[in-house]
């Protein structure tokens, strides 16, 4: 909450600040405790002045009583720092002086106090606790828990503790209480020897309750004195008394827990089982004992649950409720908390909630808790919770308000010690309230800050309750305009807002600023208001005015609000809100010492300080509940695609239409609309209707389209048809199905049995429709090998004897579209052996995809250089030469072929783009040389495949997805050198053999035995006869 700095803002700035704070729902500065004019009392330095504080009155005089447990006493100068109680007059004390109370006590060490009692007041801490009897002449209890009985000091010094009952007038001698003293008891730890009574004290009308945490070896106990018969109630519960070191009595209080007419006492034991406990006891007058009726436990070790207590009837049901502090409760470090227990009757308490303030680091929230009475005049008591170590020991105090449900969880006010005065330290260690200290009819609050030896009195400001009424017509008829905005007829309504205020002891008049806002519910939702005011010729959704009000007088202002044309939402009510804040307060005559305080507006439990009222649009309904019955039908249409197509091909379809039909079978449907939840990758193009039917669409989000149907309402038994068109060109295809969730709704109630046809889901599968192809080339397409081929034409690997022929194959995969190909694989197979048992011919060096948009798996030959070894002889060689065959074709599709297959996976391939794969290989020619073929033809086959799981569909009858790449190895036919020599030699030998064979044959046939001599002589005779005439006759 704001502090003094905010309260000192100038008049203009204060008005703006108040309006802003009204809008935020929190009061300016503090709520109704005046932090601008604190009344501060200062005590002796280093005295812990303010360790305990108490508001007190006697007759018409108001006092602030202050404990200073480390002060020196002017009445006991020989005693070392016994502590003191100071009284500070509130009125007629302009210098804020405080004087020490004279308790007329012994001034020397060892003063007698009983048969076996001698008192030692050194460092007794008088004023460690203060309490007041709750009546007009109530006495005051002041205690010094470190007071010691030194009668047996040779054996033990007994810190019994000491309390003093001071009369109401603070003048006469009071009554000494040493509740733990028992004659002839001298043991230190046992029973009450070290009880330290008075560390905490509480006063009821009849009982004095004093905590004694040191009794029974620090199990602790309560000392409860009945003032009526001057007897003590005893605690005889062995289960409690035997729990050593629990410190029962560290904090005490009392209230009406079991019955409105019965007083019960409460004791805190912050060390009980390490978590702390709180016990409620009934003071049984018959037995004179304390009987346990309730107990509660802390939640965390070391939280010191029960070290502060406050009994207060928060909900005013006649039974006390209980607040328990745990100042060392830690989430990080000692933030502290307070647990609130509500009384369920008969002493049974139930935890309602826990308070944490601001949960500040090391704040020790809950170190002190005080009942303040009803400081804001709302009929319920309020409480203050101290956090003295907050803000590095500056301290803070939080104010909480009771109500019919118990306590308001949010504090109404936070008082920062640092903001009140930068010198304050441990502000909030002690708090006292419940008494009207300045006479304005409201209880005030006094807070101690003992490390700065200070006490601050904060006065409560009068609280004003403003009654606001907003008068509106019961309904608005939007079918018959009653007003004009310029020349245009419009619907309108009369708005009247009235104010009056009341409050206790509010002097003078008040100025009130207010803002009247039209259709505030729409504004809170970030939507434009449906109604507006016309001010000075301009439209406005809000009117701001200032009023001067006198007590209980009502003032009203009248306005006309116009309804906007073509209002879509005619079902939700129109809410008007009047938010208000105080302006100026006309003061009466001021007292110079304690001036009258300006009033504040009543806090509304953290809500906006405003008033609302609403009206509705008039509706024509036949049924009592005005229930509509919307019925939705729809169909998907893909552009330029056959209706029978079962899917949407990405890239092929440019837009998609949803044909919608909506019918109303019930009463008139107000604010009827059809909404479309669609993919964020779709873009809304347009809405189409055959004829104007009052349908309009608005894209509220990238994936949410809302279409209003009918204006101002969709009539009963009517039917509307329209289409909405979306652009599908940006669909990525990440989703398998494109879904449209269509919902029809209206502002009317619609019966549950009629909702089944209000929602429609339209879907269409998304696929990638592609036409892929693959082509390939090889380099070189052919090459020559053989013994006579120069070795420089080939490649030799390091330390290898083999000669290799480089072979490079380039494949290109192309996507004709229309969709992007999300992924594909390419396989290439080629023969790798001449025969099933032969050696591997190829060494794959690399296989890469262009632009690194894919990856390939390689199978490298571990023994790329193999030279086949065969048992040859000259005759085999010559035979091979003369028996060479023609062409050998190696093809993986032939049976018995041994092939090498390589694979590549390609990334997404957009429409009309290609991807290149380069395969680099080496062919071992040494293996080819062993083959007798003159030409070896290699058939490499490559194929592209799409993955069905990626929802890819190939276009039927499209481009081929397979290609054939052919390259040839040509064997050089020249024989080897030694073979040529052998051929010549063998040829000569064969020729001679043939000649000899012919000669023998001729000889056998007698060719060489002819009668050449007779033939010659016959020929000679023939010639001679030709020369004569009778050669013929002679011959005959």
From Swiss-Prot:
Transmembrane segments: 982-1002
Binding locations of Ca(2+) 1: 313, 315, 317, 321
Signal peptide: 1-28
UniProt repeat feature FG-GAP, residue ranges: 36-97, 109-175, 183-233, 234-290, 291-350, 352-409, 412-475
Tissue specificity annotation: Expressed in the media layer of the arterial wall (at protein level). Expressed in the airway epithelium, skeletal muscle, basal keratincytes, the basal epithelium of the cornea, hepatocytes, giant cells in the spleen and smooth muscle of the stomach, duodenum and veins (at protein level).
The keyword Membrane belongs to this UniProt entry's keyword annotation: yes
Membrane topology, Cytoplasmic segments: 1003-1036
Cross-referenced SUPFAM superfamilies: Integrin alpha N-terminal domain, Integrin domains
Quaternary structure, from the entry: Heterodimer of an alpha and a beta subunit. Alpha-9 (ITGA9) associates with beta-1 (ITGB1). Integrin ITGA9:ITGB1 interacts with FBLN5 (via N-terminus). Integrin ITGA9:ITGB1 interacts with SPP1/OPN (via N-terminus). Integrin ITGA9:ITGB1 interacts with TNC/TNFN3 (via the 3rd Fibronectin type-III domain). Integrin ITGA9:ITGB1 interacts with SVEP1/polydom (via Sushi domain 21); thereby inhibits Ca(2+) intracellular signaling and as a result represses vasocontraction.
Name of the protein this chain belongs to: Integrin alpha-9
Species assigned in the record: Mus musculus (Mouse)
Lineage: Eukaryota, Metazoa, Chordata, Craniata, Vertebrata
């Amino acid at each position: 909450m704001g502090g003094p700095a905010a309260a000192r803002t100038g008049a203009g700035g204060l008005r703006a600040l108040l309006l802003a704070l009204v809008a935020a729902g929190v009061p300016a500065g503090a709520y109704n405790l005046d932090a601008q004019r604190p009344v501060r009392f200062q005590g002796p330095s280093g005295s812990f002045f303010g360790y305990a504080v108490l508001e007190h009155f006697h007759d018409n005089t108001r006092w602030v009583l202050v404990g200073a447990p480390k002060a020196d006493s002017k009445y006991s100068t020989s005693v070392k720092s016994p502590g003191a109680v100071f009284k500070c007059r509130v009125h007629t004390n302009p210098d804020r002086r405080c004087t020490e109370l004279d308790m007329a006590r012994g001034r020397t060490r060892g003063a007698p106090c009983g048969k076996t009692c001698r008192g030692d007041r050194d460092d007794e801490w008088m004023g460690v606790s203060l309490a007041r009897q709750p009546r007009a002449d109530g006495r005051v209890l002041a205690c010094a828990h470190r007071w010691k009985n030194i009668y047996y000091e040779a054996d033990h010094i007994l810190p019994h503790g000491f309390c003093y009952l001071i009369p109401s007038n603070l003048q006469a001698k009071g009554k000494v209480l040493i509740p733990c003293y028992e004659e002839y008891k001298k043991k230190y730890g046992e029973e009450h020897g070290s009880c330290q009574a008075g560390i905490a004290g509480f006063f009821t009308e009849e009982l004095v309750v004093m905590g004694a945490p040191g009794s029974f070896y620090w199990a602790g106990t309560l000392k409860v004195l009945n003032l009526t018969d001057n007897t003590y109630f005893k605690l005889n519960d062995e289960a409690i008394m035997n729990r050593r070191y629990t410190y029962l009595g560290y904090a005490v209080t009392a209230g009406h827990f079991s019955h409105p007419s019965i007083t019960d006492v409460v004791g805190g034991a912050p060390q009980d089982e390490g978590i702390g406990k709180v016990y409620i006891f009934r003071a049984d007058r018959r037995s004179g004992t304390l009987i346990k009726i309730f107990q509660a436990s802390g939640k965390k070790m070391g939280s010191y649950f029960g070290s502060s207590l406050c009994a207060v009837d928060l909900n005013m049901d006649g039974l006390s409720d209980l607040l328990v502090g745990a100042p060392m409760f830690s989430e990080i470090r000692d933030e502290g908390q307070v647990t609130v227990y509500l009384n369920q009757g008969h002493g049974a308490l139930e935890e309602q909630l826990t308070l944490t303030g601001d949960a500040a680091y090391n704040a020790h929230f809950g170190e002190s808790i005080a009942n303040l009475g009803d400081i804001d005049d709302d009929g319920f008591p309020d409480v203050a919770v101290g956090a003295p170590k907050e803000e590095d020991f500056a301290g803070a105090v939080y104010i909480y308000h009771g109500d019919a449900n118990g306590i308001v969880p949010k504090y109404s006010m936070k008082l920062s010690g640092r903001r009140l005065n930068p010198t304050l330290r441990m502000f909030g260690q002690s708090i006292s309230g419940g008494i009207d200290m300045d006479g304005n009819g409201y209880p005030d609050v006094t807070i101690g800050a003992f490390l700065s030896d200070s006490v601050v009195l904060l006065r409560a400001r009068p609280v004003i309750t403003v009654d606001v009424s907003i008068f509106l017509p019961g309904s608005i008829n939007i079918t018959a305009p009653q007003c004009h905005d310029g020349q245009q007829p419009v619907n309108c309504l009369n708005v009247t807002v009235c104010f009056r205020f009341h409050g206790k002891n509010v002097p003078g008049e008040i100025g009130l600023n207010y803002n009247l806002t039209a259709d505030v519910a729409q504004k809170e939702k970030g939507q434009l208001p449906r109604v507006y005011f016309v001010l000075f010729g301009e439209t406005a959704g809000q009117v701001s005015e200032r009023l001067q009000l006198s007590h209980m007088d009502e003032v009203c202002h009248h306005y006309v609000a116009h309804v906007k044309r073509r209002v879509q939402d005619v079902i939700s009510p129109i809410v008007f809100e009047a938010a208000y804040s105080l302006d100026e307060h006309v003061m009466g005559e001021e007292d110079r010492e304690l001036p009258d305080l300006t009033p504040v507006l009543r806090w509304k439990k953290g809500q906006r300080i405003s008033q609302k009222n609403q009206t509705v649009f008039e509706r024509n309904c036949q049924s009592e509940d005005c229930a509509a019955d919307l019925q939705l039908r729809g169909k998907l249409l893909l552009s330029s695609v056959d209706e029978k197509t079962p899917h949407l091909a990405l890239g092929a379809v440019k837009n998609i239409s949803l044909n919608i039909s909506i019918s109303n079978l019930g009463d008139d449907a107000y604010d009827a609309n059809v909404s479309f939840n669609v993919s964020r990758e779709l873009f809304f193009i347009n809405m189409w209707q055959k004829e104007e039917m009052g349908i309009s669409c608005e894209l509220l989000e990238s994936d949410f389209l809302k279409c209003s149907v009918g204006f101002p309402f969709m009539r009963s038994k009517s039917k509307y048809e329209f289409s909405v068109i979306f652009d599908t060109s940006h669909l990525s295809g990440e989703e398998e199905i494109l879904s449209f969730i269509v919902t029809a709704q209206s502002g009317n109630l619609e019966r549950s049995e009629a909702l089944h046809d209000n929602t429609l889901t339209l879907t269409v599968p998304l696929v990638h429709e592609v036409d892929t192809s693959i082509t390939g080339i090889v380099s070189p397409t052919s090459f020559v090998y053989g013994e006579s081929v120069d070795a420089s034409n080939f490649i030799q690997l390091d330390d290898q004897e083999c000669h290799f022929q480089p072979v490079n194959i380039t494949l290109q995969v192309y996507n004709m579209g229309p969709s992007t190909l999300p992924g594909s694989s390419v396989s290439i197979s080629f023969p790798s052996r001449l025969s099933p048992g032969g050696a591997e011919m190829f060494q794959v060096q690399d296989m890469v995809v262009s632009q690194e948009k894919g990856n390939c798996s390689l199978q490298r030959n571990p023994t790329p250089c193999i030279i086949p070894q065969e048992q040859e002889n000259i005759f085999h060689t010559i035979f091979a030469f003369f028996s060479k065959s023609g062409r050998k074709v190696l093809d993986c599709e032939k049976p018995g072929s041994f092939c090498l297959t390589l694979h590549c996976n390609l990334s997404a391939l957009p429409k009309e783009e290609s991807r290149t794969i380069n395969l680099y290989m080496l062919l071992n020619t040494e293996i080819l040389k062993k083959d007798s073929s003159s030409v070896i033809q290699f058939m490499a086959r490559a194929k592209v495949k799409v993955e069905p799981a990626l929802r890819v569909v190939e276009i039927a009858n499209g481009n081929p997805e397979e290609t054939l790449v052919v390259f040839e190895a040509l064997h050089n036919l020249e024989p080897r050198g030694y073979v040529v020599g052998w051929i010549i030699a063998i040829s000569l030998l064969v020729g001679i053999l043939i000649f000899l064979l012919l000669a023998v044959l001729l000889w056998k046939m007698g060719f060489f035995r002819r009668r050449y001599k007779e033939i010659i002589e016959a020929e000679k005779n023939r010639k001679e006869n030709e020369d004569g005439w009778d050669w013929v006759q002679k011959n005959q």
